[in-house]
């Protein structure tokens, strides 16, 4: 495979040994596919909006004479595009129009004759739409709906593991979980009776459920027990023998037949005895009559003459009943077969505690349990029970639930409905009893075959259905009110409940989260996050250790590394790199199929359920050139995910990639295999907090995962079609599309507008920079412009920094870092932060607020940065406390004296009835105003500034559209010119004519004439579309804004701050090696090497051994080698050596070991391409060391040698202050360092006086509340230990909550008197009141 033009600019050397069989799939599939299914019409009506409509409609009136039917739906085009919605603070959504049909039937007619049909389209609220990047814009902010991992519907068998009862007895239970509807549980109690619960309410004997289904005692016993038949023959009692049932019992009598004793009394019956009995075909044995005593009758035995029941079903047989049965003429007696070992008498025992006796009494019992306090009637109790599990409206197992149910109970696949049947309930009870009897095992609820993913589409559909059901109730009421002649479907439907349900879900659900937009990786990870929390999921407090732990089914599905630290650990996971969900919502991972020990190219996705039956080899198994395993035994995962050694011919599948275990964030960590898991977790999490730097710098040591993440995140601009760059500037790129990719009759021009300096959710800066030049050939899918944190289409979260591992005067104690001043001077970690501040003018009771520059009691200097409308200029440098938007609010009328009233009447209104409520820059913030936006309510007059902004927007829109039109016209006329010249026209003559005249020419060739006419039509179309677009844009700009009720105007001011790195900022590497900057050191004081090159950061070597993240050391070595090669290339370029020398050196670097995936052949490159490549490699040769398949020690040494560096990776350094040599070589190299979004500027905070808590009167805490620092009990102990009594008294009284004391203190300080007069702290009064509230009077004696 060759490289394209832009790929040749910079090629990453790959150390991977194994070929890439499968590319990393598109990373946002889980979001986009799910939402597509929700919105796109499904002809079968199995999913999405269609399914929701079909499940609720038709709505039939109570009398059955009218019904409202659903026909179909359509989504309108959204009014504003994504960008406009973000600016305006509105939701990016499309209106939903549903075609409904109201059918009324003739009441008089005997057959259902249609009397009237009305059909019209009804508006049903708005559905938020997903942007191309898998996010939603809700009220102007980007949000992500996180997928949820919840328990799959179906049936689960579990046990309490002996924790419930003090005896430690294991109690088994079964639970049928539907997708929606009531849960049904069966459970054993310590006495081995079987109970049922509905919706986790009070338990009832399980046989009540069976009776409610209509079964009699005899039928219930028949369902669950085998029978033993006894025959009465004279005074003898014969038992029908099934030898297998006797295994393990002790014979209580001699088992003999035909005069031969098979088992003597008191002996244990073994398999040998059973064999002998079977061999001689013994079917009956004589038993003593005591043997039947205590056995349980399997049916009612009735005296046929008197009708009296001698022995009821489930009654015990005694000597008395035996005699009566013989007397009544019964020759055979059937009893239940039970034993203590593996056929327990559970159902029989349960029937004894069951208070009910027939179906009605059972239904009454269930009714009383579900609705205590209501008197049951036969109809209501029957209806309640049927609605619980047998009504499709109230109960649905769903296709997933039915599939899991059938698999668990070994029913045929694909059979059964969404509701339960009698057979289903009996099968569950049977399996539970089998498990109690020791046959079968309980399920593992943490197995990923029992947990499924619920994504956006499915959750949105459920919310939509909830809204529809609310509407259904209202419609039913309206339909039953009569007078349907005048009513149309439009009148019946109120869209409010639907839009409220949808809005609530997208706006405030626990799973609808504010998008983490620090950098492209954090966006991608957030969209691939899988949470076990949320509605219908777990809660943090209740989740135990097992749920949070890594399970062997996570392999290739959920990342074992990336999860938050803290209370959510293990509950929030990340999707593995190659994982996807299947139609049922279970996670699948890809494997290569293995046939007879040969690995094929065929790839199959397996879910955790399917995987259980296969043996799967690891991705790093050794293969020969025919893809056969070379080892006699291969490490593979077999039953239950346990790994072992297997023969090649026993293996069914093989892993696709070494990276398939981990998530994309963990796959970005080079040498992950050498890091401790805890540190790797921190590394994966901290990459998401990296702030995009001013100039992105690709990592020298990467993993090859950088490209897919940058492309899929959507922050970079990617070419939709191939072509040539025709125009490029900072804000737009124009591509002339290749002829073979254009559609007939279009201009063949693609225009990409770039995003410039906008604010992200985390206040970081989003800006796109073109990375192509005029005339560059472009292929489809290539990067045209880099976004934040991307460099030539590769993810670049930080900077490559020269580091040394050595102590330096205690400045790197406890993970601190010593940073060189050069890093600050070169702006390596300078970041731009954009803050949005808004000012709202409302209509108050006392009058409306006004935005104006005329503010009472404010000096001229404070207004110097405002224009005449009272709004700050763009470009103004502002600092804390400056006014950004002047605003005055009407004050309440104060009572005026008659004299004042007279003055008022004479001089007119004074400005004293308004107070200043201007928007000011918050304290501690400073920056430059980069943009101002004014939104004015419809019908409110726009101020001068708003009109100026409007005019500017109109100008820009017109300029943009005109430029676009010119580019498209140029493309069209070029085609016209070519057409005319090819038909024999003279080029010089044509150029003299006006271009529009070209279209009026005639050509003899009819086909060409048609083409010309087509182009003329296109030209007209272009002009028309231009006019139309301009008009639409003009209307949008001029139109008033849709603001919240009571709001007249909103002014948004954007401030940009450039933040350089400084002591107190938090930095980190990719291996969980985080630290705080302790000092910025002058360059001349930093340690330097023999060439006089100083290091940029000094790290503490003691941070490595105990943390066990050795990956950082290997990264440092490999980084040094990569930079060494870059330096060599740079020297050759400076010396202007011939291209061949350059080519062979670079070729040598690429050929050095590794490169399992793709060989780089520079002989196919032109000299110009080699030079351009060399130019991009000056700063270092970028290398990729894939996770679990990376560079080893020998390879790093080879690369160091090629770069002309010592293979130890250690260099002699000299002290920058004294010039002395350090006594031993130091590990120096290049590490990729990130600046995290924990900046000291955002954390620094100080308070003198401020707000106090209402009850305790103590200062509030935290920067947001402008709070104080808590002087806690340990600090109090410290002062006590020092005996600093007065200081302690001051801390606990006047500095805290002694209200009078602190007022006095304030006065004293003002008057220059340093005296303290402490009183009683307010919190003491609080505790006194609390004690009084307990009914104990407590008083302070003043003496």
UniProtKB/Swiss-Prot annotation:
Keywords: DNA-directed RNA polymerase, Nucleotidyltransferase, Transcription, Transferase. The lineage of its organism: Bacteria, Pseudomonadati, Pseudomonadota, Gammaproteobacteria, Pasteurellales. The RNAP catalytic core consists of 2 alpha, 1 beta, 1 beta' and 1 omega subunit. When a sigma factor is associated with the core the holoenzyme is formed, which can initiate transcription. HAMAP family: RNApol_bact_RpoB. This is DNA-directed RNA polymerase subunit beta. The keyword Nucleotidyltransferase applies. The keyword Protein transport does not apply. Belongs to the RNA polymerase beta chain family. Coiled coil: none annotated. It comes from Haemophilus influenzae (strain PittEE). DNA-dependent RNA polymerase catalyzes the transcription of DNA into RNA using the four ribonucleoside triphosphates as substrates. GO terms for biological process: DNA-templated transcription. One of its GO terms (molecular function) is DNA binding. Its EC number is 2.7.7.6. It catalyses: RNA(n) + a ribonucleoside 5'-triphosphate = RNA(n+1) + diphosphate. GO terms for cellular component: DNA-directed RNA polymerase complex. It is an enzyme of class 2 (transferase).
